[in-house]
């Protein structure tokens, strides 16, 4: 269980440090979701059966997040010419 927390914190650190490309931000978010999913899987293996439904919902949301993130990446890279976060006007 400690390793899942460590993976989550590494992904959070990567999210904070890699602010250049949109794809790297999406990969860090996906790594955070996978670590949460694995953590819920470890809890359900240890004897508690109620997180199993939550894990399935989390897996569904992470699949939707990945597909919408990749669609957004394609849209932005076609309209702006690159996926650099510094080239976006977020204000």
Swiss-Prot record:
Record's subcellular location: Mitochondrion inner membrane
Keywords of this entry: Electron transport, Membrane, Mitochondrion, Mitochondrion inner membrane, NAD, Respiratory chain, Translocase, Transmembrane, Transmembrane helix, Transport, Ubiquinone
Membrane topology: Multi-pass membrane protein
Annotated transmembrane regions: 2-22, 38-58
Gene Ontology annotations for the cellular component aspect, listed alphabetically: mitochondrial inner membrane
Pfam families hit by this protein: Oxidored_q2
Catalytic activity: a ubiquinone + NADH + 5 H(+)(in) = a ubiquinol + NAD(+) + 4 H(+)(out)
Enzyme Commission numbers on file: 7.1.1.2
InterPro entries per record: NUOK/Mnh_C1-like
GO molecular function: NADH dehydrogenase (ubiquinone) activity
Top-level taxon of the source organism: Eukaryota
Assembly description: Core subunit of respiratory chain NADH dehydrogenase (Complex I) which is composed of 45 different subunits.
Family stated for the protein in its record: Belongs to the complex I subunit 4L family.
Free-text function comment from the UniProt entry: Core subunit of the mitochondrial membrane respiratory chain NADH dehydrogenase (Complex I) which catalyzes electron transfer from NADH through the respiratory chain, using ubiquinone as an electron acceptor.
Protein name: NADH-ubiquinone oxidoreductase chain 4L
Organism: Branchiostoma lanceolatum (Common lancelet)
